[in-house]
Each structure stands twice: as structure tokens, then as C-alpha cells.
Amino acid sequence: YGTASLGAAVAIKEQIEKGNLKGTVIFYGTPAEETIFAKVWMVREGVFDKLDVCMDWHPGDTTESGTQSSKALVDFRVSFNGSSSHASSDPWNGRSAVDAMELYTTGLNYYREHILPTSRIHYQFEAAGDVVNVVPDYAKIWTRLRGNSVEHVNDLYDRALDIAKAAAMMTGTTYETKLISGIYEILVNRTGAAIMQDNMETLGDISFSNDEVSYANTILKESGKPQIGLDGKLKPLMPTLPATGGSTDVGDVSQVVPVIRMSATVAAKNGPWHSWAVVA
């Protein structure tokens, strides 16, 4: 990932020094890629303001120019505070923070029926009491909301905050929300994608050795997937596509500078992503 980006930057630098290219190349180290938010802070501090264009790539199981957007998202935490009591001797004196959290997630799950098919709601319990015989006085949950535009994500966020408030009211608890961060969707650069496609066609398909294909099939077999090896064939330039899956803080970069994107095959075809199979 970073190594390939550095290699590309060095190659461009050498061509500039030889007089074959004109311009300036800047290599950015962008940390914490999978936490999504590092580039948000970099954009805020004006790190990319001097650029005419930014080039971004992502490893994948296909080789293609980037023509697809990504999902905007917002991350936030909700904490509920109640009052402890013995769960059997005097539960009537307790106010369960976990009850509030459960009602919050129930509200989110009923809300799913009324959101766009392109929207997503995720959550993870982070604190939910310690022992079973005590009414828990504290609970905390991390929530992530996604949509194909930041405007729609803001609508999801407003509704989720109302659901948290209602959950606290129903249980006689108090609640607090803490915004973690949020990111924009990618603005697809159609002109840049066509230029990237021309250059990728000059290079052609990626070739893999028999040993590499065999290793990929071993990974697929162990993952319970069809053994279809590696796909190094360059895809034709695709139409501009809306987001279908993930999110990236490159979206924020694309709001302030044109971004040209591509992916290259580094993993077995249709293998399970975010797993040790891809790491291997």
C-alpha cells in the first residue's frame, strides 16, 4: 500500500530529474487508513491545498481505474447513565443504563425499515454493566451511520440522536452523545479516470506466476471460496457509479482537490476482505 505509493512517487521524481516530465511530486504519508478519519484532519489543516491533483490507489482483487463513489458516514458514541441497585432485592430503585441502550438499538433497528436501501446502520456495544445481579448504571455504544451523500447522513444522525433521547426518557436515565468524526463521499473525477485508464492500458494486464495463482487458490480453499485464483486483467473504463459498500477519508480530499483513483490486484479473487486471507 504505502510502499507502492512511495515507489510511484520516486519513479515520477526520477523522470522529473531526467527532464522527461515537468512538475512537482509530493508523497504524503496518510496514517490510520482503516480508522477512516486521518485525512479529515489533514484536509482541515490545509495539507492538500497546494495540489493541482491528488492520486490515490487501493489494493484489491481487480485492476481498474476508479469511477465509483464511496459512502459518507458519521461516527459517534452514546453513553447512558442510570442508578445502581440490587437486581433482585430492590430493582425498583434502579435505573438501568443497559435498558436504555437496548431501547436505543431497538429504535435504530425499527428505523432501518424507513431508510434508503443505500444507507447503513452499524453499532458496537462498548460498555454494558459488570455483574448480572446489579442494575447497571452505565452503558456506552459506538454507532456508525452511512449513506451515499453527507446530506443524507446528517438526516440519519438527527434521527439517531432523537432515538437516544427517547431511550433515556423511557428508562428514567440520562444520556450523552459524543461526535467522533464524519467523512464525505468521493467526488468522482471522470476526466482523471479516463487519463488513468489510458495509462493503465499502456501498461496492460498484470501477470501472475503459476506459484502465485496456486498460493491464491490455497487461500481461497481454506476460506471456503471457489478457487478462481488471481484476476490481473485490466477492466474497461466503467461508467460513473454510486457507492455500494465502503467509506474512505479520501472523500474529504476529493472535496478540496481533484482526485484520480485506481485499484490493482494484490489478493485472491473474491476472497474475504478485512481478514487474514487478504493479509496472506
Residue ranges and their predicted role:
Residues A11-Q15, G107:
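Active-site catalytic microenvironments for nucleophilic, acid-base chemistry
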Residues L6, G19-P136, R146:
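Histidine/acidic-residue-rich, glycine-tolerant segments that coordinate divalent metal ions
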Residues G2, I36, I186:
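Loop/helix-junction capping segments adjacent to catalytic residues or to phosphate/diphosphate-binding pockets
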Residues Y1-I12:
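Di-metal (Zn2+ and/or Mg2+/Mn2+) metal-binding site signature of metallo-dependent hydrolases
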Residues Y1, D90-G94, V153:
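Alpha-helix N-cap/helix-initiation motif
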Residues Y1, H58, H86, P272-S275:
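Histidine-centered active-site/metal-ligand motif
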Residues E102-A280:
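Metal-dependent amide/peptide-bond hydrolase catalytic core
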